[in-house]
């Protein structure tokens, strides 16, 4: 039998739902929405990095700024 520890007793409620699955699709659509938003965010960052998305009055320079 495994040794019981104080940390294990504190974390036990987090593992009480192990093996149980929500019926149907559960939160899958919500996860898909957040994945899509994250993908759009990454696309915008990549476009700014490649200067293919131009922002007015924003200079994109990877050299040190001069005073």
Swiss-Prot record:
SUPFAM superfamilies xref list: Photosystem II 10 kDa phosphoprotein PsbH
InterPro entries noted in UniProt: PSII_PsbH, PSII_PsbH_sf
UniProt keyword DNA repair present: no
Topology relative to the membrane: Single-pass membrane protein
Location(s) in or outside the cell: Plastid, Cyanelle thylakoid membrane
Cellular component aspect of the GO annotation: cyanelle thylakoid membrane; photosystem II
Entry superkingdom: Eukaryota
Keyword Thylakoid carried by entry: yes
GO biological process assignments: photosynthesis; protein stabilization
Record keywords, A-Z: Cyanelle, Membrane, Photosynthesis, Photosystem II, Plastid, Thylakoid, Transmembrane, Transmembrane helix
GO molecular function: phosphate ion binding
Main location: plastid
Membrane-spanning parts: 29-49
Function in brief: One of the components of the core complex of photosystem II (PSII), required for its stability and/or assembly. PSII is a light-driven water:plastoquinone oxidoreductase that uses light energy to abstract electrons from H(2)O, generating O(2) and a proton gradient subsequently used for ATP formation. It consists of a core antenna complex that captures photons, and an electron transfer chain that converts photonic excitation into a charge separation.
The family this protein is said to belong to: Belongs to the PsbH family.
Subunit and partners: PSII is composed of 1 copy each of membrane proteins PsbA, PsbB, PsbC, PsbD, PsbE, PsbF, PsbH, PsbI, PsbJ, PsbK, PsbL, PsbM, PsbT, PsbX, PsbY, PsbZ, Psb30/Ycf12, at least 3 peripheral proteins of the oxygen-evolving complex and a large number of cofactors. It forms dimeric complexes.
Protein's recorded name: Photosystem II reaction center protein H
Organism of provenance: Cyanophora paradoxa
Source species taxonomy: Eukaryota, Glaucocystophyceae, Cyanophoraceae, Cyanophora
GN (gene name): psbH
